[in-house]
Regions:
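Hydrophobic face of amphipathic alpha-helices that form TPR/SEL1-like repeat modules
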Residues: 8-9, 14, 42-49, 53, ...
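Helix-adjacent hinge/juxtasegments
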Residues: 62-63, 69-71, 77, 81
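Alpha-solenoid helical repeat scaffolds
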Residues: 41-42, 77-78, 93, 110-114, ...
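Canonical positions in the second alpha-helix
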Residues: 30-31, 65-67, 102-103, 138-139
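Structural signature of tandem alpha-helical TPR/SEL1-like repeats
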Residues: 17-26, 54-63, 90-99, 126-137
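Alpha-helical segment of the N-proximal tetratricopeptide repeat
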Residues: 4-34
Length: 145
């Protein structure tokens, strides 16, 4: 990234943080199209929640998946929830578990906890209380299940 690009990206992130979402989307879009995972993730959030514009499930999924496939842990977690809840994409517990596991492998404790709950409840995966206990323990909960 050039100095100008750094300044533009910083401005786009500042617009997002200031909740100027329509402007942020416009500024983040070129970076997302160039493969910037953080820009892709932020755009996904804007489209998924209809922030500053009409909600767009197709674009929310497109950008969340693009960022997740690049290894962006928060996007992997977000994509896991999309699949778990059937939001922006068809509900798919196996896919949810796969993306939560990828995020958990990068240290996302929330993904570990969600995965543990899935195994505890048999939600989208086969119920496995032993696996649920193991995951809860990894997430820092000693007395769960």
């Amino acid at each position: 990234m050039s100095f100008e690009d750094d300044v533009d990206f910083s401005s786009a992130m500042a617009a997002f943080e200031a909740k100027h979402f329509a402007r942020a989307a416009q500024m983040l879009s070129p970076f997302a199209q160039q493969g910037n995972a953080e820009a892709q993730h932020r755009l996904a959030i804007i489209y998924q929640n209809g922030l500053g514009m009409t909600r767009n499930d197709e674009l929310a999924y497109k950008w969340m998946r693009a960022a997740a496939e690049q290894g962006h842990a928060l996007a992997q977690h977000g994509l896991g929830f999309m699949y778990l809840e059937g939001e922006c994409v068809e509900k798919n517990g196996e896919e949810a578990a796969r993306w939560f596991q990828m995020a958990a492998d990068q240290g996302m404790a929330g993904s570990l906890t969600t995965l543990a709950m899935m195994y505890e409840q048999g939600n989208g995966v086969e119920q496995d209380l032993e696996e649920a206990r193991r995951l809860y323990k990894l997430a820092g909960f000693d007395d769960a299940v």
